[in-house]
């Protein structure tokens, strides 16, 4: 089995061995923790997979809808986490479809992170102090 370092991010498709749209049951033999979210605006199930250091969000039927990388995210042999956002735009010739500012509590302190959506690529990039902090991977076509 290949690991995230070998496979990385395939936009609109997968991260490592985890495929968008697939059922989470395929992955539950791996070490993980599970959380349930039932908010007023959404509900989902979140799994954190320790080896890959990723969070996987699922619909109530178990279908993977989002993969979240906060420690490591390989894309075209480059780790996006910690990369300067301006370098990301230049290196991959990308421009966001939309952007927003969201206040996030990190380690008890607030950060106003810039959130950029790249809808055609199924990517949402969270940036603080011009460095990529989190990448959300989704399939806009699902």
Model regions and ranges:
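Helix-adjacent hinge/juxtasegments
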Residues: 67-70
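Short, recurring structural edge motifs at helix starts
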Residues: 12-17, 73-78
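Short acidic N-proximal helix/loop "leader" segments that mark the beginning
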Residues: 1-10
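A cross-family detector of function-defining hotspots
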Residues: 19-63, 79-134, 138-141
């Amino acid at each position: 089995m290949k690991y995230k370092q070998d496979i990385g991010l395939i936009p609109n498709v997968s991260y490592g061995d985890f495929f968008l749209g697939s059922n989470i049951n395929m992955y539950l033999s791996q070490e993980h923790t599970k959380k349930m979210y039932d908010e007023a605006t959404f509900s989902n199930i979140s799994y954190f997979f320790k080896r890959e250091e990723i969070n996987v969000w699922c619909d109530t039927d178990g279908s993977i809808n989002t993969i979240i990388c906060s420690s490591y995210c390989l894309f075209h042999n480059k780790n996006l986490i910690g990369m300067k956002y301006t370098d990301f735009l230049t290196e991959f010739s990308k421009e966001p479809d939309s952007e927003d500012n969201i206040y996030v509590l990190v380690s008890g302190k607030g950060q106003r992170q810039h959130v950029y959506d790249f809808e055609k690529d199924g990517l949402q990039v969270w940036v603080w102090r011009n460095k990529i902090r989190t990448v959300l991977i989704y399939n806009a076509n699902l």
